[in-house]
């Protein structure tokens, strides 16, 4: 029997949100996914939601006590969209908000800073700050260049990151949403080891049975590349600066948060690569 009040997931058809939704449903929770399109999860309730239209906020938030919040993607300043949403959530009685942020973005910094503060005004809150997703290697960010060129291109130099599987983020998010005692903290989430992109490329190449290399470019080159790919200039500038920060050690850390919160060891990149090798060989021949 499903619990009475729905748990709202914004970005519920995305990489992490879809994983959270499926886990909550298996645990017997009622899940409402706020999205512009209907997904494939049969037992979820879908409601039309668009950050640009505040009129879509109230129907999504009715009867909701717990929210998983993913800010609009690719927007340098999401506060004008998200703060009115949180205000409406509070008015309608939402009690707990779990927000997805990023470990490389400072708590009071650009993009998420104002949202971090707003989330903390709820009676129960958690901010998840994961390192870079392992899924970036199998989606639009890096998959095609690995397939066609055997390359991963960044401005991160030799900087290391605690790459994390989205499944481990989702497991942590579920605990933050449903644990009896609210977490009331920022969770820095990483995988079990810190790796450079060159080391990641070597692991991926070994799994795929081919040579994969990391190509390091300048921050400005990366920004131009991102703009050419369709990112707004301000957001491309911000993202390229994050890569530069990584090159100086901003992401060189490993935490035990996933294990502490979920009781499970996070997945390694070697394990992830072995399970996803087919993603990097589809268009490649010797």
Curated annotation (Swiss-Prot):
It is an enzyme of class 1 (oxidoreductase). InterPro entries: Ergot_Alk_Oxidoreductase (IPR051604), NAD(P)-bd_dom_sf (IPR036291), NmrA-like (IPR008030). GO terms for molecular function: oxidoreductase activity. Transmembrane segments: none annotated. Keywords: Oxidoreductase. It holds the Pfam family NmrA. The keyword Lipoprotein does not apply. Its EC number is 1.-.-.-. It comes from the Bacteria. Belongs to the NmrA-type oxidoreductase family. PANTHER family: PRESTALK A DIFFERENTIATION PROTEIN A, PTHR43162. This is Uncharacterized oxidoreductase YesF. It comes from Bacillus subtilis (strain 168). The gene is yesF.
């Amino acid at each position: 029997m499903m619990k009475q009040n729905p748990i709202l997931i914004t970005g519920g058809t995305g990489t992490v949100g879809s994983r959270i939704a499926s886990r909550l449903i298996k645990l017997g929770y009622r899940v409402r996914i706020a999205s512009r399109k209907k997904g494939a999860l049969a037992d979820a309730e879908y409601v039309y939601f668009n950050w640009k239209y505040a009129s879509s906020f109230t129907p999504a938030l009715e009867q909701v006590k717990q929210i998983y919040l993913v800010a609009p993607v690719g927007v340098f300043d999401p506060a004008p969209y998200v703060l009115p949403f949180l205000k409406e959530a509070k008015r309608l009685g939402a009690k707990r908000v779990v927000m997805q942020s990023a470990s490389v973005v400072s708590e009071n910094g650009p993009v998420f800073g104002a949202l971090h503060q707003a989330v903390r005004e709820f009676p129960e809150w958690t901010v998840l700050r994961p390192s870079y997703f392992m899924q970036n290697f199998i989606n639009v960010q890096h998959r095609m260049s690995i397939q066609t060129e055997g390359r991963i291109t960044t401005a991160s130099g030799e900087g290391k990151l605690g790459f994390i599987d989205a499944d481990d983020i989702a497991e942590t998010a579920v605990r933050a949403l449903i644990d009896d005692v609210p977490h009331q903290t920022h969770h820095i989430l990483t995988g079990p080891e810190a790796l450079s992109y060159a080391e990641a490329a070597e692991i991926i190449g070994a799994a795929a049975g081919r040579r994969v290399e990391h190509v390091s470019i300048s921050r400005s080159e990366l920004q131009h590349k991102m703009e050419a790919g369709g990112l707004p200039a301000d957001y491309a500038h911000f993202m390229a600066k994050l890569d530069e920060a990584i090159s100086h050690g901003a992401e060189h850390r490993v935490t035990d948060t996933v294990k502490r919160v979920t009781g499970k060891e996070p997945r390694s990149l070697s394990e992830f690569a072995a399970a996803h090798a087919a993603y990097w060989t589809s268009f490649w021949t010797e």
